[in-house]
Regions:
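Glycine-rich, basic loop-to-helix element that forms the pyrophosphate-binding segment
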Residues: 70-86
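A conserved acidic beta->alpha catalytic loop
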Residues: 27, 42-51, 73, 95
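Short aromatic/hydrophobic "clamp" motif used to bind/position activated sugar donors
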Residues: 91
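Conserved nucleotide-sugar donor-binding catalytic segment
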Residues: 145-225
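Flexible acidic/His/Gly-enriched loops in nucleotide-sugar-dependent glycosyltransferase catalytic domains
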Residues: 101-180
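Membrane-interface aromatic/basic loop that binds lipid-linked glycans or pyrophosphate carriers
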Residues: 271-334
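Short, acidic, metal-binding catalytic loop of nucleotide-sugar glycosyltransferases
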Residues: 26-35
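N-proximal low-complexity "stem/linker" segments adjacent to membrane-targeting elements
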Residues: 1-27
Length: 334
């Protein structure tokens, strides 16, 4: 007797995606695997997204399509609603900008093993005139839990939630945090691994996920720059807090990673400051001052970078611009 195919719930949070939602939906409908429910969560879209999604409800499909509307609350709340509504044995997340290969779900199910997370490699497709698309392949097989957590914490392992198939039964009491703007996927994945004592991640060899990136405009707004830094800092600290206390070595790695990753984010955001007013507001921010103070006192930060942090917080506008420009030139020369 043929074994019954497990139902897969595909959760797709959607916000103002009228240009991309159809291709995303079709890539799920056209899967070689049939026992699928597609859960569309409309996060308060204000463009034509709703009409496109509802048209697929009216057309009918070989897969079960469900539609839910919520007042705009962000992707984390939308994903949590999808988790609660899901009826499948397994859950897969797909972003409304992206597409999946037609045999993606079938390959995930075939390779699924108890106590193991199955992951995928992906292709980056950038919405630019430059031919700078990329393929991210992960060949490593993980069989030690702390090695998985270590690589997630320091950023060597992709925490993108759409790369993995999750067991619904094992997701009890694991949700996305609504106040997290950065690394919410990584935080969710770490919780799932710790709660279920996962020791193995196996990656499929072929490319199954198409990750579409659009060019972001230059951030030249103080509130946004400060918010980026504060949100990222908050995310890193939350990850550090969920690592079990007895994992002292991993805790220390997390602390070191926090300092290095926050420093890089600060540099990326500060380098985008192009106006005198923006720099002054950044330098006056008490929250930023506190973060900089902690980084300067951190023994994991190199002395040269500490000087950079001090300089950007205290230098006049012209000196600041010159310093940032010289630093960018030196980086390109390396």
């Amino acid at each position: 007797m043929k074994k019954k195919e497990p139902k897969i719930s595909v959760i797709m949070p959607v916000y103002n995606a009228e240009k991309t939602i159809e291709r995303a939906i079709l890539s799920v409908i056209n899967q070689t695997y049939n026992n699928i429910e597609l859960i569309l969560i409309n996060d308060g879209s204000t463009d034509g997204t709703e009409n496109i999604m509802k048209s697929y409800l009216e057309k009918g499909s070989k897969i079960d399509i469900k539609y839910y509307f919520q007042k705009n609350s962000g992707p984390s709340i939308a994903k949590n609603l999808g988790i609660n509504m899901a009826k499948g044995e397994y859950i897969l997340f797909v972003d409304s900008d992206d597409t999946i290969s037609e045999n993606y779900i079938e390959s995930l199910v075939i390779n699924q093993k108890e106590g193991t997370i199955i992951g995928a490699s992906y292709k980056i497709i950038r919405d630019t005139e430059k031919n700078d698309n990329g393929i991210i392949i992960t060949n490593k097989i993980y069989d030690i839990r702390n090695e998985i957590l270590n690589d997630l914490v320091i950023g060597n392992l992709n925490g993108f939630i759409w790369l993995y198939l999750f067991n619904k039964e094992k997701m009890k009491n694991i949700y996305f945090e609504k106040d997290i703007r950065y690394m919410e996927d990584t935080l969710f994945l770490i919780k799932y691994i710790i709660n279920n004592n996962i020791n193995n991640i196996i990656y499929l060899k072929d490319i199954y996920y198409n990750y579409y990136q659009t060019d972001g405009s230059i951030t030249n707004n103080t509130n946004k720059i400060i918010k980026n830094i504060l949100s990222f800092t908050n995310s890193i600290r939350k990850i550090e807090n969920i690592i079990p206390k007895e994992e002292k070595e991993l805790k220390e790695i997390c602390k070191k990673s926090r300092a290095n990753r926050i420093s890089k984010l600060i540099e990326n955001n500060v380098s985008k400051i192009k106006e005198r007013k923006i720099l002054k507001e950044y330098q006056k921010s008490e929250e930023i001052k506190q973060i900089i103070k902690e980084l300067i006192e951190d023994c994991n930060i190199k002395s040269g970078y500490k000087l950079y942090l001090k300089f950007t917080m205290n230098s006049p506008y012209i000196l600041f611009l010159s310093y940032v420009k010289i630093r960018e030139i030196l980086k390109k020369m390396k």
